[in-house]
Structures are given as structure tokens and as C-alpha cells.
Amino acid sequence: MGKPTLLEPGHLYNVPAEHKNDIPIHYIITWIKQRLPEFGGAIPTSLADRVLIIKSRTGSGKSTALPVHVFRILRNENTHSFQKYLGRSVICTQPRVLTAVTLAKDIGASTHYPDMILGQTVGYQTKPLTEKPNRGLIYATAGVLLAQLHTMTDDEIASRYAFMIIDEAHERALGIDLMLMYIKSMLERMLQRGSIGALRIPFVILTSATIDTHKYSTYFGIGKENIILVEGRQFGVETHWPLYNTNNYIKTACETALTIHKENIHDRPTEADILIFMPGMGEIRFLSTLLNNANMDLAKEKLPLMLILPIDSEAIAQENEAYLGLKAEIKNLWVKNPLTAKVEKPLRRVIVSTVVAETGLTIETLKYVIDPGWNRSVETYYPEWAGGLITRPAAQSRIEQRKGRVGRVFPGHFYPLYTKHVFEQIPAQQYPEIITEGPGAIFLNIVVETIKKNKEGVFKAEEIDMLDPPPTDALASAIERAIVGGLLTRGEKGLQLTQLGDIASRFSFLSIEEARMCFSGYFWQAAISDIAIILAVVSVVDKKLTNLLDSKQRNGAMLAEAVLAGIPPFLQHIDNAYTNIHLLLADDLLEGLFIFEGFQHAIVYFINNKVNNLAKHLREWCEKKMLKYSSMVQILARREDILNELAIVGLNPFHQWQNRLASANAETFLKRVCTLKQCIYEAYRLNCFCYDEHRLLYTGRNGIHFSYHDTVIKNPSCIVTPRIMLAPVSKQYMEWRLEPSFVSVLDGFVNMDINFLLPRQEIPNILGGVEDEEEEEPPLPIQVFLHNYVKTHFHFSGKSFKELKMKPSQMIKFPETTLINMIPDIPKNVVQTYLEINVCHQYSFKRLIYCETFYTNMDDVQHENAVELIGLPMAAHHLTINDFNKLYRVLKPDGFLIVYDLHNSQEAYWLHSLQDALGHHTIRRDMDFHTITEWETIFKECGFSPIFSKQPSEHELFIVFKK
């Protein structure tokens, strides 16, 4: 086995010429020591003294040799291993559990590092698995360090860690981007404290094989001298490009693996394994079935067999048979002959894996990689806030990582299932999750960190200091949800956290909606344990409740049995129990609550009976109920996380324990159902949808619609769902439809705030007539302001507003409640909120009037603020005559009035309201006005002069009057 290139001379580049032939690790350690005061270096004064970027190709030892040698800076290499290390630690973050655990175990078992002993000087810390020393080299998932940065002070972090190594820094998960934001802010704060803070400031090292060095160095404000480039593997990797693309990559992957196996039948078992990447577990199962069938053919031909190992995050967490087979030596493994049923030694392992095997994992027997070139990740689309798992071509950087799994200890082979031309067309880097998903659960963390840097203590969007800020539409949607959830409010100087927002910002892993539901639980006196279970079900279960069932033949009967296992005793003996409970609850989330309650009953039963191997009995119970054991365990863990989060911030996680829904009786059951539904509604009320009897669809305020059918509950008038999912229409074509994830029926359970059902529309081109692509769009005053403001303050990932080539009305698509709130310091003389007036019938979008000052209600309208009104089409609900009186009373002296698309039956209502408001001439209600002249005549009698008018068609007109 060759040494990692970090330990061999002559692999450095982008360094001074006299150091080209240095051993890379020696050069790196010397570079670091020169900047440490304890080794004679100066006290750090800038980030350049504490941030180093190492772009080191796969196979160089950046995940193994580098952390060990950095740790040896702190612990003398010659120190006896039995002497306990008491200094500060080195933390090396990994994007996945598998790599963190594997690297720590491999280093602890390696003869190359006798001073690194697992549990004493090296260890791992992940959410599900931990074995680490109090001080030493700690491999951890990024989430572990993120949680510490979120909850600990700068000094606490500095006293714990001397070095932070962010391995695979090119990964752009939300947590990693937030972690880098935290780290940068911490370093800046400690540097601002002068020598007192700078002496113990941690050293940060970013490592990756495919990192964009320019982007990261610019973000941290460091120069080229802080970037070290190291060559990678010593052994070549041959790429076998196909002549044609495939239209069935699973079948082609199987055929390719079988061809490799047959053509290389004389491979040594220690240099023979195949790794195949698949985008998801469904594809892994399908491919594993095909490969096992191929083993049957091999057995018939009396050829050596393959051992098929399906690997994903679940297999790693459970350390199942496949994972143990991955970690074992090939000589100790056996495979069953499908013909003779006898066991025999396999020639090679075929590892079928998701992206968990993409980075930081070394399989020393791996010789071949087969890559279909796909990647599956969550994408969310705003402002509709609809998302789902989308399968797209993997970026070139990810493909290089996959290719880098081979060629580490002997030459390897890479088999892409796409042509070289296709590879050259796909993006070089993956899109960051903050772009594809939006800020999501980390939004409040971003707000808090941004507020810390603002002298006035307010949140300003343009001050977000991240590698890539959230997209404007995603940011606007997040602000809206935070305001509606009561976590953000507008102060005199900008957006500020409310008291609830301050509490919510202390949560490490709770989203806006999760925090709001917990707060609502305390307000409505709900059992917080029930709230935690509901949120855990939403977090773990994908799309619908039947996905909890561990069976290909999922059906209502299986789901019914699982639900009935957890219902209150008084309901267990009624006829048609599930049907009646389904009618009674009208709620997928509450049914999920009962499914988990049944699982909890089983836990209590087995514990009370003192069974041996509790996990085995629970797994058997889940198999009997057709439930996924792994999902139930994840719900249990997530529920505990939520309850712990509440306890950490000082809230009682056992609040109203005695009022749990599962313990209700006939008298209290419906009351508790209503209470929980109220909490669900308050958390997700922006996702309310009403049934449109004419279109036979559910429509919401976002302008989106979907169909929803329940076999028992027929077309409820109003439902709420935690999220809108993108569901594939067919496997053959990349087409998607919208569908709710879980449904909670509100009819008769919750008194809704109807204002949250107002649809949102794009700002139209009112004054410009029909849009002509050849002509510049005449912008509205509000658009002019936003155009100039956005052009000045938002950069859109490096592109100016002009470069985007978007017209204002195309650009500004924000909901009415956030169009202005997203811009924290908007001048007072610019429009800041809206007052809705309904002048339309059921199916038309008519108008929205907004004023120049933020009003909490109509009573706050003052004359001097109502200088100008501009009409926009927007559906709204009826205001009362008193509301009209208040509005037009302040308009009478010098205001504008707009008539837009008013005709037929609605004119009587409008004119009657206007008559009462203005107190002018009697207006005949039976008059039908269809022309500009007719409208001008009647409003002239009321003291208004037309200053602009247009009538595109018989039933469309637009008039601006001035008092």
C-alpha cells in the first residue's frame, strides 16, 4: 500500500518554488506553527492568521493523515500513549455519519498511528453513535459542531477546540453553510477583543478535493498564501466512457457490473470490489434484486458469485448485516449459492449505495466504480412553498468524488453510464441547499447571527453574511412565515425578534412552524408530548401516513390496524372502529399520533415484562403491525429531540401530560382533538386550502391548487397541510403534480382567520396596457422604488439586477404581507402595507389598495398619511361600511380614487358603499355603468376629476380620479 500523497514529497503546488519538493504535511504543519504564538508566531490580527484552505485531491490523506498531524501539534508525537491528554481538542467534521465513524475507527486501529487509540486519543461523535475521549482528535458530523456553536459561547468553544477541520467543505448543506457563518462570526468577534480573545482563537482548516478556493477565500477575506494545493492519488483511474447514453440506468448498471465480474474473473478478492451509486433506496432495492438474479445465472454457469451489499444511512445507523459485511474482511464473508443453498466464498462484493459512500470513505478492496450520474435532493419552490425529492444530474464535483473512491491503493476503473459529452455539459459545482431548499429550519439562526452584527439590533436582509444568501423569494417567504408565526415583528428601525422569536431562536433544530406549534400548545393547554409526536411524524414520514407501512402492498386495512393499536380504551370496542375514528378525527396527523402511541404501548409492555433484547421484540411487533421499525425509532428519537429542545430553553416538556389524547375519555376526547387541531392550524395556517366546488380542486392563497380525495370524508370545505409536495406524475417523464403531505380537516374544529386565505398575485402592469416584449415596461411607483432598492442592495449571487434582464413586475412576486417587510429599512414615505377592499365577485381578481404607513387596523389610518392610493388587482374579502367610512373620510380632502374593472352586479354594492362613505349625492343602485364616460359622470358629482382612464375591452376599464 502506498502512502497518502500528503506524506510523500513532490506533491505540492501553488506554494513558493523552494517548497515544491517538500513533504506536504510538513509544509502545512510548519505553515500553521508560524502563526501560533506558542511556537513564536505573532498574535493573530485578522482571519488570514486563522483560516487555511487545503484543496487536496482524493486519496491524499486529508481526512486521515492531516487531522492526526494537526493533533500532534498539540500533543507531542513522542508522548507515551498511556499518558492522558488534557489539552484542547481537534474536531474534524464530516458530512455523514458513516465517514465520521469509519475514519475514527480506522485511525484507532491503524499501525501507522500507534499514539491514536480509539476512546483515548481519537473518537467519533455523531447523533446516533458516540465513542470519544474527553480531549483528543474527534471526528464528528457537521451537525454536532453546529449545535455547539449555536448553544455555547465563543470562549467555551475556544476552550474546547484548538483546531476546527471542516472536511469536505465543498458540501453545501444548510447546516454546513450555517456552520461556516457561525465560525466566521466567532473568529471576527474574538479578533475584535484584541489580544485577550485572539490568544485562544481556534485555527480553522477547510479541506476538500473539489472546493472552489476563490469563493471560500473571498468569503473569509484571505489571500492566495492561505491556499495550499496537494496532488491526490498515486494510482491511475481509467475512465470507460460509453458511446451512448442509457435510458434505463438501473438495468445498465446491473449489466455493467455483471460484465466487469465475468471479464475479470481472475481478480484477487482483495482487489475486486465494485461500488455502484444509486440516487435512492428504491433504486437500491431494485438493483439489488437484479444483481441477486444475476447470481442465479452465475451459479448456473458455475462461476464465482458476488456478495450484494445495499448501503444507505439507515443501514449504517442500525449497523445491519450489509454494513457489517462492508466493514469485514472479504476472506471472512460468505454468500449463499441460489442453486445449491450452500454457502461459498464470494469473489467480490458489489456495494450498492446512496451518496453516503461518496466522500471520506475508503474501501481498500475497491477497484471499480459504476456511476449512473444522478443525485436526489430536496428542492423547494417559493412563494408556493412546495417541495419534494427531485432527481437531477449530479454535478461534476460530485462525480469526481465518486470517481475518487478508487485508485487509492491500486489502479482503479470508473464506469460512467453517460457519455463524456454529457459530463461536460452538467454544472461544475452542486447548487447549495440554501438555493434549492431556501433557509428552512435555519432561518431564525440566520436572523439572530445577522442581528448580532447590526448596531441597531435589527435584521436587514442585505447584511446576511453567508457564502450564498437565501434567494429573495425564499427569504421573503421565510420572513412572512416568521411574522405570521409571531416570531418577527417590525420595529421602528426594522425587523426585530419578538419575545417568542427570542425563545425560538434558542432552539437548535426547530423550524418556524415547529416552534409555533409548541408555543400554541402551551397557550391552548395541549399536551406538549402530543405536539412533539405530531411534529416528529411530520419530520420523519415522507408525503403520507401509509409510508410508515413496511409493505409493498400498503392498504387502508394495514393502516387501520396500526392506528387502532394506540387509540383511547373507550374507542376500542365500537363498531367499524377505524372508519368512525377516521370520521371523528378527520386528521392524518392525529392518526399518526395514535400509530406512535401504539408503539409506545409496546415499549412499556415489553419493559414491564422485563424482556431480553427490547429492540428485537419491538422489531417483531412492528413486523406484525406492518410498520417500518426504523421509521418508528426515528420518530421516537425526533420526539425526544423536540422535548429536549423545549427543556433546554426552560419550557416544561411534560406540560399537560395528563391531557394526552390517548388518555382521553368520551367527555374530553373531542375537546382535546379541537385543541390539537388549533395548534396544527396556528403552525401551518399559511397552508390552508379551501374547496372550490366549481373547479373540484382545493385552492390556497398562493394561487396553487391540487386535488384531494378521501374515501370517507367527502370534500371538506377547508383543510390545512404541513407542506405541499411535488409528486412524480410518471417514472418515465420528469413531470410533477402538487399534493398535500398530511391533511388536517378544519371544518367544525377551528375558527379560522379568513384573511390568511387571500390569494397572492404578481404585481401587474396596470398603466402599461398589454405587455410588449419589444418595449420597456412602464413601472409603478412601488416598482420604481423596489427596482432601485433591489439593484442597490441585493446581488443575486453576483449578478446585478440589470444583468438578470428582468422587468420589475417579473421580479417582484412577493406576497402582500412581505413585499415590504422583507426590506427592513424602507423609508417611511414609501408604501409599507396594504388595505384590502372587496369590489369583486367570486371569480375575479379586482383590486388592492395600499397606503404609505403600516397600519395594524383601519382605526390607525390618519389623514396626513393617505396622500396617494394606487389600485392593484387582488381578490379580497368584504370590508364593512364602517371600514369604507374610515378609509374615505381621510381620502376626501386630497386623495386619489381608482375604479378598476367594476361592472355588472358589483357596481350597486360599490356605489352604495361610496355613497355612504362620501355623504354625497344619492346614487341609483339600479344603474349599470359600462363605459368610462358613465363612471366619470357619477364621480364628478362626488367631487372627483379623472386624470387617467383606459378601457381595453367592453368589460375592462381603469380610471384614476383625484379629489
From Swiss-Prot:
Domain of life assignment: Viruses
Domain Helicase ATP-binding, residue spans: 43-229
CDD domains: DEXHc_RHA-like (cd17917)
PROSITE patterns: DEAH_ATP_HELICASE (PS00690), HELICASE_ATP_BIND_1 (PS51192), HELICASE_CTER (PS51194)
Chain ranges for the short sequence motif DEAH box as given in the UniProt record: 167-170
Helicase C-terminal domain span: 253-459
Keywords in alphabetical order: ATP-binding, Helicase, Host membrane, Hydrolase, Membrane, Nucleotide-binding, Transmembrane, Transmembrane helix, Virion
EC code: 3.6.4.13
InterPro entries: DEAD/DEAH_box_helicase_dom, DNA/RNA_helicase_DEAH_CS, Helicase_ATP-bd, Helicase_C-like, P-loop_NTPase, SAM-dependent_MTases_sf
Conditions for induction: Expressed in the late phase of the viral replicative cycle.
GO cellular component, one term: host cell membrane
Pfam families recorded: DEAD
Membrane topology qualifier: Single-pass membrane protein
Location(s) in or outside the cell: Host membrane; Virion
Gene3D superfamilies linked to this entry: P-loop containing nucleotide triphosphate hydrolases (3.40.50.300), Vaccinia Virus protein VP39 (3.40.50.150)
Protein family according to the UniProt entry: Belongs to the DEAD box helicase family. DEAH subfamily.
Descriptive protein name: Putative RNA Helicase B962L
Protein species of origin: African swine fever virus (isolate Tick/Malawi/Lil 20-1/1983)
